[in-house]
């Protein structure tokens, strides 16, 4: 009888040891899958400034909740998706008085980011931004970048 008190726990321990030595997939680090190629980090392509937009090429779009004194356009002739998957476009914001704010921009649909590459220099030409940076596009703030991302340029 004393022997069975010692034998059963010892047998259970011997059975449990190989199970405990197995790989713990949610605890141990995963081994890379050799069948999946390594993903290269994203790299932005070269930027060429487009020609300055012409009035006849502007396509108006609506921005819900925006003040009524502005109208929004993109240059339909120079809208492109690069090999780097960045949508590049010229944005024109026009006030009721006729003043234009013109910028050449890029939008990364997958990461909800946008970047301004150049602005109107006041002489009908683009002036490059010295060090353009990607900015997060707010997902719940009505504005031209949200509208372009959600309803026009990044539709899945």
Q: What residues fall within each predicted segment?
A:
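Short N-terminal alpha-helical targeting/association segments
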Residues: 14-15, 143
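N-terminal secretory-pathway/extracellular module detecting exported/lumenal segments
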Residues: 22-156
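Bacterial N-terminal signal peptides that target proteins for export
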Residues: 1-8
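N-terminal signal peptide c-region/cleavage motif recognized by signal peptidases
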Residues: 16-20
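C-terminal active-site/capping subdomain that shapes the small-molecule cofactor and substrate pocket
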Residues: 11
């Amino acid at each position: 009888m004393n022997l069975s008190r010692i034998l059963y726990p010892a047998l259970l321990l011997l059975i449990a040891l190989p199970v405990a030595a197995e790989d713990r997939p949610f605890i141990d680090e995963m081994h890379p899958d050799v069948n999946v190629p390594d993903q290269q980090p994203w790299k932005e392509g070269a930027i060429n400034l487009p020609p300055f937009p012409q009035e006849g090429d502007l396509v108006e779009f609506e921005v819900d909740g925006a003040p009524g004194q502005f109208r929004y356009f993109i240059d339909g002739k120079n809208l492109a998706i690069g090999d780097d998957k960045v949508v590049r476009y010229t944005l024109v914001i026009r006030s009721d008085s006729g003043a234009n704010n013109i910028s050449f921009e890029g939008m990364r649909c997958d990461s909800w980011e946008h970047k301004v590459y150049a602005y109107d220099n006041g002489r009908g030409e683009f002036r490059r931004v010295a060090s353009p940076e990607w900015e997060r596009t707010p997902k719940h703030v009505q504005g031209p970048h949200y509208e372009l991302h959600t309803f026009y340029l990044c539709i899945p």
